[in-house]
């Protein structure tokens, strides 16, 4: 203990990052997972509990720089929340406290989805009006693909039929020539998975654009023809493109062989995201939609969930780095209102950091940063000893593998 205290004092006097190093070495995977689950539930509960109780529209606040998007904000919150929490729910219930918590939220989510697609429910959501509903029908579809047993499998036949009807309503919306093309693709992928048929034109168009025209190199896609330095490769492009191709390959659809290339690109992009995490557990505040908070790490979490991290990245270092980010991002009570709803911001209540298309519902994309909770507690991601992430090692004077482009 004396040596630890002396190390901390020496670090404070010299500026050396002793405290972050000690943090990385002292935290167990079990403790990290508890932090993730606690934060996940805190974020998701207001959305899922109110939707299950048919009080979402009544209770969910509306905050935005634009006054005219409230009617779409509910599906935004629902689709994004389910997209992020689905892998964790897919583990199913068990006798552990966490397993019982999953049971609770599986039941709430299944009931909530049934309400969201029921025209007689006060929480019936809009899927077929241009243009925003396409985005969040897509996130809902991706969530269903991520939990086929616990969510889709537990819906009643009538609710499944109505989900299909509502997803098909989004076909009237023409996507922009940007990441939006993948929203149409993922909706069709879900329809293919759950009904055995889809609109192959809408399915394939986005895949071909990103594969043939919009790849810029070293795992970076343009958001359309142009490249933008933001996190949309993580918010949308890599995760949705990968999930679409997984469905295409499963159903032996033409052009699904691109999945092998895409998985390598996802792994490389995940490696880049891991290197964005500073020794202190922060990351660059750059690009639009930065108020999606931990949604920045959607692609990194997906690569971990699918065991697609590059060989030189130890899963535990991703766990430790992301845990520190989660703690930093949600430490301030200013992230939430008095009823637990997310406020627009980055690490607090900071609405001026947002764009006009952002509203309360939009911010729940942060939950896509929690995908590794879909790995069981005995997976090496959670069970391995703590490991320092790249920047923590590099700034502590330790050896780090050279970084190579794809």
Task: List the model feature ranges, each with a label.
Residues 25-77, 83, 87, 107-114:
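Low-complexity, Ser/Thr/Pro/Gly-enriched N-terminal "stalk/linker" regions
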């Amino acid at each position: 203990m004396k040596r630890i205290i002396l190390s901390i004092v020496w670090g404070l006097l010299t500026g050396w990052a002793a405290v972050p190093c000690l943090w990385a070495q002292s935290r167990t995977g079990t403790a990290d997972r508890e932090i993730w689950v606690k934060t996940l539930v805190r974020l998701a509960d207001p959305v899922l509990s109110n939707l299950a109780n048919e009080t979402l529209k009544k209770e969910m606040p509306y905050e935005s720089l634009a006054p005219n998007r409230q009617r779409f904000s509910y599906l935004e919150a629902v689709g994004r929340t389910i997209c992020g929490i689905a892998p964790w729910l897919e583990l199913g219930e068990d006798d552990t406290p966490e397993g019982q918590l999953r049971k609770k939220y599986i039941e709430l989510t299944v009931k909530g989805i049934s309400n969201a697609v029921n025209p007689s429910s006060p929480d019936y959501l809009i899927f077929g009006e241009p243009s925003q509903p396409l985005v969040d029908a897509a996130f809902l579809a991706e969530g269903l693909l991520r939990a086929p047993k616990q969510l889709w499998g537990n819906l009643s036949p009538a609710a499944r039929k109505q989900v299909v009807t509502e997803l098909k309503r989004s076909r009237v919306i023409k996507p922009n020539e940007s990441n939006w093309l993948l929203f149409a693709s993922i909706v069709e992928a879900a329809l293919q998975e759950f009904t055995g048929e889809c609109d192959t034109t809408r399915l394939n168009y986005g895949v071909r654009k990103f594969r043939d025209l919009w790849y810029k190199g070293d795992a970076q896609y343009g958001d359309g023809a142009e490249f933008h330095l933001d996190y949309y490769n993580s918010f949308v492009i890599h995760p949705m493109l990968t999930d679409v191709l997984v469905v295409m390959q499963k159903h032996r659809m033409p052009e699904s062989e691109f999945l092998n290339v895409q998985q390598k690109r996802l792994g490389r992009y995940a490696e880049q995201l891991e290197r964005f995490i500073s020794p202190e557990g922060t990351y660059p505040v750059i690009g639009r939609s930065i108020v999606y908070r931990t949604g920045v790490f959607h692609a990194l979490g997906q690569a971990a969930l699918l065991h697609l991290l590059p060989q030189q990245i130890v899963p535990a270092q991703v766990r430790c780095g992301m845990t520190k980010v989660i703690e930093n991002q949600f430490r301030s009570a200013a992230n939430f209102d008095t009823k637990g709803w997310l406020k627009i911001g980055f690490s607090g209540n900071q609405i001026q950091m947002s764009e006009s298309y952002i509203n309360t519902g939009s911010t729940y994309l942060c939950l896509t940063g929690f995908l590794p909770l879909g790995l069981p507690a005995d997976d090496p991601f959670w069970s391995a000893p703590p490991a320092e992430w790249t920047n923590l090692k590099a700034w502590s004077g330790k050896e780090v593998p050279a970084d190579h482009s794809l």
